Amino acid sequence: MARKKIREYDSKRLLKEHLKRLANIDLQIRSAQVTESTDFTELTNQESWLSSTKLVVKPDMLFGKRGKSGLVALKLDLAEVADFVKARLGTEVEMEGCKAPITTFIVEPFVPHDQEYYLSIVSDRLGCTISFSECGGIEIEENWDKVKTIFLPAEKSMTLEVCAPLIATLPLEVRAKIGNFIMGAFAVFQDLDFSFMEMNPFTLVDGEPFPLDMRGELDDTAAFKNFNKWGDIEFPLPFGRVLSSTENFIHGLDEKTSASLKFTVLNPKGRIWTMVAGGGASVIYADTVGDLGYASELGNYAEYSGAPNEEEVLQYARVVIDCATTDPDGRKRALLIGGGIANFTDVAATFNGIIRALREKETRLKASRMHIYVRRGGPNYQTGLARMRALGEELGVPLEVYGPEATMTGICKRAIDCIMLPDA
């Protein structure tokens, strides 16, 4: 499971659309998204309610505690909303140690209310944890002792009986309504492959549940089966995270392929760089470098999997090698081309793209004093490793090659020993 945060606008859009389909609950929520490109006249033509009611506006940037941070404005008319957005759009703010400009807002009708409830649903490998409180809102953390929680195993179904402990202390006149809403929200959670859903708070408007503030995360590995249900969904970067040009290029490649191509720069001046096959293996290699005491020298996190074709691997490897060889300083560097033992991927085929990139970057590799360490197993691995050995001899670049007879992370220790060993 890969939990990806989505904007509040999309969380509410999905809940409203699918709660009607799955539980016959018609939420009366309305919302509009505002960015730098928004034309307020055009937006008002599309959402006529914007000009006829008092409004709430707040950043929709994947961070919480907006109310406590003075970033929520209430009871504004549309002109005041436009002024509020204009004054803050592109302005850098700091939230929990992360700094970034505000780029996206959500605008909604102002809803007067007295009671605030809290609801969250979180999934894990064994089931779902569902929490509810009659004391929701910005002080939820201070009132966490009033939150009721149940755990629903994956093999069990949600029923009113299961939900009963959460709502047992509610007044009778709202108990069934809120119970049905919790069950409906859970149905949406499961059907759309949410991994996290939180409403803090939701209230009752004319006796009907009404989410005021909402957060959501989706399991993006389920995108293939939820394309139509999710619609035009966006997975924004975490607040404060800005992609470099190289990361953005790889992200674009990843979006266009059925394979997985991931690349994150951790330390541009690091001397240990990785290009690892497999999501699990890529984490193990990074953790091993850290466990050996050299996390500060780790230049990147990189992972390719899902049998990318040779051209995709070539473009991917070019970027990794370019970053790994930038600004030579006379000290040795190491590139780990690692992986476990593949089940189906043709190792020789994927190595062809890497070999082409290494051959293209010969001058950069030598200038940066790069030492290359290869470890891989799987279908056709002997051919792939033989080609790697031949490449090392051809280029005159230090290149050590290991197969499945060697431990997967043994090359991490060899790379560290190499770059830390003083020149004779």
From Swiss-Prot:
Q: Which InterPro entries match?
A: Citrate-bd, Citrate_synth_N, Succinyl-CoA_synth-like
Task: Name the catalysed reactions.
Answer: oxaloacetate + acetyl-CoA + ADP + phosphate = citrate + ATP + CoA
Q: Which UniProt keywords apply?
A: Acyltransferase, ATP-binding, Cytoplasm, Lipid biosynthesis, Lipid metabolism, Nucleotide-binding, Transferase
* Gene3D superfamilies documented for this protein: 3.30.470.110, Succinyl-CoA synthetase domains
Function recorded in the entry: ATP citrate-lyase is the primary enzyme responsible for the synthesis of cytosolic acetyl-CoA, used for the elongation of fatty acids and biosynthesis of isoprenoids, flavonoids and malonated derivatives. May supply substrate to the cytosolic acetyl-CoA carboxylase, which generates the malonyl-CoA used for the synthesis of a multitude of compounds, including very long chain fatty acids and flavonoids. Required for normal growth and development and elongation of C18 fatty acids to C20 to C24 fatty acids in seeds.
Organism of this sequence:
Arabidopsis thaliana
Q: In the UniProt record, does the keyword ATP-binding occur? A: yes
EC number(s) from the headed UniProt entry = 2.3.3.8
Can you say where in the cell this protein is located? Cytoplasm, Cytosol
GO BP of this protein: acetyl-CoA biosynthetic process; lipid metabolic process
Q: Which Pfam families match?
A: Citrate_bind, Citrate_synth_N
Name recorded for this polypeptide:
ATP-citrate synthase alpha chain protein 3
> What residue range is the signal peptide?
none
> Of which family is this protein a member?
Belongs to the succinate/malate CoA ligase beta subunit family.
Tell me, how does this one assemble?
Heterooctamer of 4 alpha and 4 beta chains.
Q: Which GO terms describe its cellular component?
A: cytosol; extracellular region
